[in-house]
Amino acid sequence: MSRIGKQPIPVPAGVDVTIEGQSISVKGPKGTLGLTVAEPIKVARNDDGAIVVTRPDDERRNRSLHGLSRTLVSNLVTGVTQGYTTKMEIFGVGYRVQLKGSNLEFALGYSHPVVIEAPEGITFAVQAPTKFTVSGIDKQKVGQIAANIRRLRRPDPYKGKGVRYEGEQIRRKVGKTGK
């Protein structure tokens, strides 16, 4: 049995879970999220009201999907109750970010400012010209937007300039030695 998959997912008060066949919908104080679980995996509620994810047999594919499905459903419940936030920071002379409406405008050393529009369900917040956060209820969407922003100017291994996650350690390289 999967160590992760066999654990029931507690449903906090104020969260409404609807299970119809392979699709599950979770509604909470921050919004509504849905998921379609892969075919052999079954999702149900137990007597305590918690969500239980089960698999029909110990086939390799089903074992893999068991833990994955349980984690994805757990992420839905966490998303509609607490939400997800990714903190990011910018290093480099003249590199900065500012909020323009609901969009982010970056100055990253290019000849033009780079504007990132906020997709539906994602909010941006700027704490300082070099620190900002990406927030939302969908963990996958928040992570993907943060990765796309980081890709605008990846951290440089020689000088450390660029956009990075807060607390991310950049592996530095030694430059050429002069004669």
UniProtKB/Swiss-Prot annotation:
Membrane-spanning segments: none
Cross-referenced Pfam families: Ribosomal_L6
A GO-annotated cellular component: cytosolic large ribosomal subunit
Alphabetized UniProt keyword annotations: Ribonucleoprotein, Ribosomal protein, RNA-binding, rRNA-binding
GO MF annotations in UniProt: rRNA binding; structural constituent of ribosome
Gene Ontology biological-process annotations: cytoplasmic translation
PANTHER family named in the record: 60S/50S RIBOSOMAL PROTEIN L6/L9, LARGE RIBOSOMAL SUBUNIT PROTEIN UL6M
Task of the protein: This protein binds to the 23S rRNA, and is important in its secondary structure. It is located near the subunit interface in the base of the L7/L12 stalk, and near the tRNA binding site of the peptidyltransferase center.
NCBIfam families according to UniProt: L6_bact
Subunit structure: Part of the 50S ribosomal subunit.
Family according to the record: Belongs to the universal ribosomal protein uL6 family.
Name this polypeptide is given: Large ribosomal subunit protein uL6
